[in-house]
Amino acid sequence: MEALGNFDYESYTNFTKLPSSQWGDQFLKFSIADSDFDVLEREIEVLKPKVRENIFVSSSTDKDAMKKTILSIHFLDSLGLSYHFEKEIEESLKHAFEKIEDLIADENKLHTISTIFRVFRTYGYYMSSDVFKIFKGDDGKFKESLIEDVKGMLSFYEAVHFGTTTDHILDEALSFTLNHLESLATGRRASPPHISKLIQNALHIPQHRNIQALVAREYISFYEHEEDHDETLLKLAKLNFKFLQLHYFQELKTITMWWTKLDHTSNLPPNFRERTVETWFAALMMYFEPQFSLGRIMSAKLYLVITFLDDACDTYGSISEVESLADCLERWDPDYMENLQGHMKTAFKFVMYLFKEYEEILRSQGRSFVLEKMIEEFKIIARKNLELVKWARGGHVPSFDEYIESGGAEIGTYATIACSIMGLGEIGKKEAFEWLISRPKLVRILGAKTRLMDDIADFEEDMEKGYTANALNYYMNEHGVTKEEASRELEKMNGDMNKIVNEECLKITTMPRRILMQSVNYARSLDVLYTADDVYNHREGKLKEYMRLLLVDPILL
């Protein structure tokens, strides 16, 4: 693709200059040889059979052995190792769940029950939350004696976040655990440092809402300070994460080289967002495993294009210009590009360039059918971009529900999930894309959740720009409430949506677990992006911390 042409700065109004990328080209400096991967991979393969034998080779009729296996599966998940043992985990949990009543009949430890609950719900088994009733006293409240069990309280708090719309006991548990965990983390009753840190991490973002790469890195630091940790398991976790880091550095180098070759930065006007590292981080949220390295690269490139398109339409395009771009994308024909001018023409060329890359990759995989699905999802983004631009500038005021429905598509929710399924390789079959395009409840909820969280985070900035297409703004106008009242209501909606996501993942039986996990991982990405601040757009703070944790802080063997 040729270098981008200069944009018309005269049309630049109401927008302030954004800072240039803090990362620059530093990832171009890394040089990783194939032998670096080979050395770590050999060490990993030596340890895997030992871990497998320690965890999964036990008596299938021994209740205590089954409990121990389930608790060990929790360690595998938390340490980022479960993808090495998927078959063993599946078989063990299937067998254990068939005997679930007998398994927990005499169990009265909060930590054990909470962890078993978490593991089964993680893997799609509906274990009833009634199991927690045994921890209530005669007054119907949770027993105060539970507070002394720090790890039990933490695991109970983590279990709460697997709740559905009917798990009312977990709503009670949330208040109970929150009230006490904060003092266990930092107050006068503070736990040992490594446990306090784990509690603080959970209070910021619980494991079920956090992305797997961050959970693994944080949990490795916790686990090695546990007196009863398994040395073999810990070593495997450390080697595995170092192996992941090599892939991550290689991917960042590839994406940075691709972006540099296109020469975007030298010609971009001041409000176009340069987000090479941020888009890679967003892709990492969808899958962290090494076998999906190409998928992360493909996803990061799509996010760069979506960001570029969003800036072109929201910031620089007049309604007529955005209409012309949407029309060209609808036709998907390069011959119509001559009808476009300046930045709209460049945006169209950028889209065509990326999808040509996709076409070549998918053809080599024998999966050309995916391209048609991806093109359709991208056309939807273009249509919804136009719709929101018209609402923001044309005077039409949509209802809150109408805006949320369109806004979820415009922000790229469906295209993001589709791209992540594309990156799964052979796992991403035609049926998965047809399921996504049918817009099941799970997917629609994720679109709405994205729109809500993004608009809550960016409300002040949107209003400063004069950009009125914002969920808070529409809710305030429709219901005649203050910003604070609207914020509380939207936060409540977001909490309810989390429960629906959990509920739908337990209900859906027609899709492979890995496909559903892409939806779960997408939901997790929203919490990571927006819990502290808008990580994608505000690069200081949490993003810097996350990148340091994932790529800079050493893991000592």
UniProtKB/Swiss-Prot annotation:
What main location does UniProt list? Answer: cytoplasm
Q: Where does (2E,6E)-farnesyl diphosphate bind?
A: R273, D310, D314, R451, D454
Q: GO molecular function of the protein, one example?
A: (+)-beta-chamigrene synthase activity
Pathway(s) per entry: Secondary metabolite biosynthesis; terpenoid biosynthesis
Record CDD domains: Terpene_cyclase_plant_C1
Q: Which UniProt keywords apply?
A: Cytoplasm, Lyase, Magnesium, Manganese, Metal-binding
What Gene3D superfamilies does the record tag this protein with?
Farnesyl Diphosphate Synthase, Terpene synthase, N-terminal domain
The UniProt catalytic activity note for this protein reads:
(2E,6E)-farnesyl diphosphate = (+)-alpha-barbatene + diphosphate; (2E,6E)-farnesyl diphosphate = (+)-thujopsene + diphosphate; (2E,6E)-farnesyl diphosphate = (+)-beta-chamigrene + diphosphate; (2E,6E)-farnesyl diphosphate = (+)-beta-barbatene + diphosphate
Listed cofactors: Mg(2+); Mn(2+)
Q: Which cellular compartments is it found in?
A: Cytoplasm
Q: Which domain of life is it from?
A: Eukaryota
Q: Which residues bind Mg(2+) 2?
A: D310, D314
Q: Give the GO biological process terms.
A: diterpenoid biosynthetic process; sesquiterpene biosynthetic process; sesquiterpenoid biosynthetic process
Q: Where is this motif: DDXXD motif?
A: 310-314
Record function comment: Involved in the biosynthesis of over 15 sesquiterpenes (C15). The major products are (+)-alpha-barbatene (27.3%), (+)-thujopsene (17.8%) and (+)-beta-chamigrene (9.9%). Can use farnesyl diphosphate or geranyl diphosphate as substrates, but not geranylgeranyl diphosphate.
**What name does this protein carry?**
Alpha-barbatene synthase
